Amino acid sequence: MMTSSQFVRKRRESALGLATGALLGCLALCVSAQASAEEVKAGPWRPLFDGRTLDGWTPKVAKHPSGENYHQTFVVDHGVIRVSYAGYDKLDGQFGHLFYKTPFKAYRLRLTYRFLTDGGLPDTPAWARSNSGIMFDSQSPESMTVEQPFPVSIEFQLLGKEGDTPRPTGAVCTPGTNITIDGVTAKDHCTPPTNAPTVPNGTWVKAELEVLPNGEISQKINGVVVHHYADVTLDPDDTVAGGAKPYILARGAQRVTDGYIALQSEGHPIEFKDVEIQELTAP
């Protein structure tokens, strides 16, 4: 039988062992994540937006064919891409996306955005107010149906402040896709971050996206990682990317390893600038 002093010493040794194990596990994850980010060859940063025109970009607005910039939804003004509703009377479900011309596989993307302080259209749904996003790993605009509201993609969601309720920017959403977070398939269409700010409209925010060759993805807001996930696959059971079922079923639940980048128009004016990309390759 152990004496009381032996018992206390044994408990301390056990607690120390657990703490040490937890610390080593954490360090291993940190080192692994760092290694994943470091074990790539990075090309030069280059602009996707020239600051003057929409050359290289293709609009796709729901209910309209690819290439039609309906009511000049996407305009360039003083070095920014602006989502404008000046020509609209109502939104009428006409969500839009502005696609860059070529798909990408592994890269870092950075841009700056701000929601304008003037409100959206009167029939913009409550969830879509002060709401936009960066779509990536996306299908092409030409492969979308005319009525399709959202492309099959991953969305780096951008939110502005609405009312007094916390509304952190930087969620990840999955129209037509699945992802895993900490090895578990995300159940909700959108997963909000736990450490991102609620940003008042009119404030410029820096958004950064990293898509590694091994399929790991990180999202940053103002330099802080707000999401890390992996394993992008198509979701045959999706109900969000309306009209995309044939596109998804033709490909099965396959892993998504590349795709297009698009900027979203979802019912509220927003501006984007300094859109740049750095392509990555495995060593």
Predicted regions and their residues:
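N-terminal secretory signal peptides that target proteins for export/translocation
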Residues: 1-16
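Short, low-complexity, intrinsically disordered N-terminal modules
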Residues: 5-8, 29, 33
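Bacterial N-terminal signal peptides
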Residues: 17-30
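Carbohydrate-interacting regions of secretory-pathway proteins
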Residues: 35-283
